[in-house]
Structures are given as C-alpha cells and as structure tokens.
Amino acid sequence: MADQKDYYETLGVSRDADDDTIRKAFRKLSKKYHPDLNHAPGAEQKFKDINEAYQVLSDPQKRAAYDQYGSADGPQGFGGAGAGQGGFSDFGGGQGGFGGFDDIFSQFFGGAGGGAQANPSAPRQGADLQYRMDLTFEEAIFGKDTKISYDREAVCHTCNGSGAKPGTSPVTCHKCHGSGYIQVQRNTAFGAMMTRQVCDVCGGTGKEIKEKCPTCHGTGHEQERHTIDVKVPAGVEDGQQMRLQQAGEAGTNGGPYGDLYIVFRVAPSKKYQRDGSEIYLTIPLSFAQAALGDEIKVDTVHGAVELKIPAGTQSQTKFRLRGKGAPRLRGNGTGDQIVTVEVQTPKHLNEKQKSALMQFAAASGEDVTPHNGTLFDRVKEAFKGGK
C-alpha cells in the first residue's frame, strides 16, 4: 500500500490495547467526528479513518495480520499480484505511474515511490471543533459580544504536555534508541524483507515515559471547560460559520491548537423576512389609503420611518427603504428594506359605507348590484315571498 497507516495512532491507543480499550476509543472518536455532528473541514475524512482503523483492530485475524505485515490483508497487501493480474498492477493508474510497485518501494523507503514518510515525532496541530450558537433575528443583524463555554482537550496543566510525572522527564526509548523507528521483517512479493516502521513503544517520538503524569496518565492532554469571548459580527446569516484560530483542541508533540468553528443558527422573525442584506415586510393598506394616498409609519429593524403612499397604489406594490436592511459583512454598507402593501377589501360595511360606495360606483359609471346576505338569508326571503 502506498501509505502505511498507523491504526493505533488513529484511535489514540497503544499497540497492546485490549478490545475494550479499542472499542471505547472508537466510540468516543466516532461521536466526535461524525459528519452529522462535526462540520469542520477534515472531520469527514477523520471519521472515515477512524472507522477503517476500528474495522481492522476489532477483528482478531485482521489485527494479527496488521501487526505482522502492516496490512490487514497480510503479505499480499504489499504489492503482491492479485489473481488475474498477470503479476503486475495497473501502470499509470493514478498512483504516481507505478501502481503496486509504489507499495513495495514504501516498504524500503517509508513512502510511495521512495518519498519520505511523515515524521511521527513532528509537531501536529490539534483537532478542530464546532460550536453552534443560537441568535435572535435582531442579534444576527446587529451582532453582539458574548461568552461561550465548551469542552475541549487541552495541554495538561500538571506536566505541561510532556506526559511525564512532575520532576521527571521522558527518557530515550529503549527499543528504537531515540530514532522513532524500528526495523522489522516482512514478507513481500520478493520474499522476506527488512523494512522500517514507527516504533510501537514510543509511537515515533523517540522518547518513552517511565513515570506517567498522574493527571493525564502520559497523554499530555486533559479535558477542560474552556470559556472565551466572542464578537458576533453584524449581518451574519443562518448557517454561516466563523473561525476562531487556535481555540480548538491541543496539538501533539508541541503542535498548535486546532481551530474552533462557530456555526450560527438564526431564529426566524414573526414580522420580517430576510434574504442576504435585504429585509422584507408586508403591511396592510386600506381601500381608502390606496385610492387617496397617505403618509404612514412603517416598522424597520432600525426603528419606525415615514412612508408616503401615492394615490392609486395597487395591491402588491413594493417600496424600497434605503439603508434599512441588514449590514453587509466585510463592511460593504447596509442593505434595504422592501415593503410590500396588500390592499384590504372591507368585509363588513355599515349602511353609510355602502351608500358612499354606491355613490362612488355611480360616479364612476358602474352599474353595481350589491350581493346582500348569505345564501341562508336569501332562501328565507324566498320562502317568505311565496306565502
């Protein structure tokens, strides 16, 4: 295989971990990186790697083969010809041009095609985290300053990340003598070969801890409840996210903290609708206001403003209130509020109102026959007339 994966490192367990330890580590990590719960970049791939590692280490036969050959497939996992392949893998098949030969080269040189394998003792950035923040409609528009608290894996305060008991220090690994790698014999397509792999005692660090820290038990990390100040920018929308650098989990080997991604969940407004920086509001308008025109007060998120309604305004007419929408992110001004009027037809008229409308109809040259009463009323009148 082109890249040798350290499944023990993926699950964060030692090579002599029992089945229960492996199962607990898998459950913890799969919950943490599940794509439905963690939308941070790289979380989905991490989840796949965790599942792959567990599928191998939870199966006694696959684990034994992996421990012996570095592959769950046994010796054929290192460039051996599969059935019906005539002894060669596909040339130029997206693996750097040498197909299965990259797998064999990796046994000698620690990487595909002789490339260098990643140094397991090198500093690595910690995992990213995600935090969902609920906002009201108005908070999303105007922004706010707040504090949030969440659980994360931090550098152990007792040993400062060394994993060693205070007053002691890690010592040179007795197995790899500080190199981080050991030579092992593996069966390949060319027979038994000596190859290099990450030391199973020190995990590639070149150091081993004789006396472990009583707080973190040698991991160098501990769980903490972390609280930080957050400035929510004005104009955020539902589903948008903001990155806070190095507010995630602690790195390994002295690497930096990961990042925290805050995902905003904005509650809908009972009055307004929003699309980007534009805010929409629908208001009722009486028949008289629409016909004669009027000057009315209209609510906006910035406060009430005057709006002139021209005479003869039709239902569904839209008016634009400049600068009364939501702020545009990155300081590009403020959007507008779009007001749509709905002309209301009166449902219940008194005699005076009916008379006025009849006069209006006559003045307009309309011959209107009012439809009075309900169907039940008209039926009653018909029976009365027949007596």
UniProtKB/Swiss-Prot annotation:
A zinc finger (CR-type) spans 143-225. Homodimer. The lineage of its organism: Bacteria, Bacillati, Bacillota, Bacilli, Lactobacillales. Its cofactor is Zn(2+). PROSITE patterns: DNAJ_1 (PS00636), DNAJ_2 (PS50076), ZF_CR (PS51188). CXXCXGXG motif repeats lie at residues 156-163, 173-180, 199-206, 213-220. Zn(2+) 1 binds at C156, C159, C213, C216. GO terms for molecular function: ATP binding; heat shock protein binding; unfolded protein binding; zinc ion binding. Binds 2 Zn(2+) ions per monomer. It comes from Lacticaseibacillus paracasei (strain ATCC 334 / BCRC 17002 / CCUG 31169 / CIP 107868 / KCTC 3260 / NRRL B-441) (Lactobacillus paracasei). Participates actively in the response to hyperosmotic and heat shock by preventing the aggregation of stress-denatured proteins and by disaggregating proteins, also in an autonomous, DnaK-independent fashion. Unfolded proteins bind initially to DnaJ; upon interaction with the DnaJ-bound protein, DnaK hydrolyzes its bound ATP, resulting in the formation of a stable complex. GrpE releases ADP from DnaK; ATP binding to DnaK triggers the release of the substrate protein, thus completing the reaction cycle. Zn(2+) 2 binds at C173, C176, C199, C202. This is Chaperone protein DnaJ. Belongs to the DnaJ family. One of its GO terms (biological process) is chaperone cofactor-dependent protein refolding. It comes from the Bacteria. The J domain is necessary and sufficient to stimulate DnaK ATPase activity. Zinc center 1 plays an important role in the autonomous, DnaK-independent chaperone activity of DnaJ. Zinc center 2 is essential for interaction with DnaK and for DnaJ activity. GO terms for cellular component: cytoplasm. Keywords: Chaperone, Cytoplasm, DNA replication, Metal-binding, Repeat, Stress response, Zinc, Zinc-finger. It is found in: Cytoplasm. Residues 6-70 form the J domain. The keyword Metal-binding applies. Its main location: cytoplasm. InterPro entries: DnaJ, DnaJ_C, DnaJ_domain, DnaJ_domain_CS, HSP40/DnaJ_pept-bd, HSP_DnaJ_Cys-rich_dom, HSP_DnaJ_Cys-rich_dom_sf, J_dom_sf. HAMAP family: DnaJ.
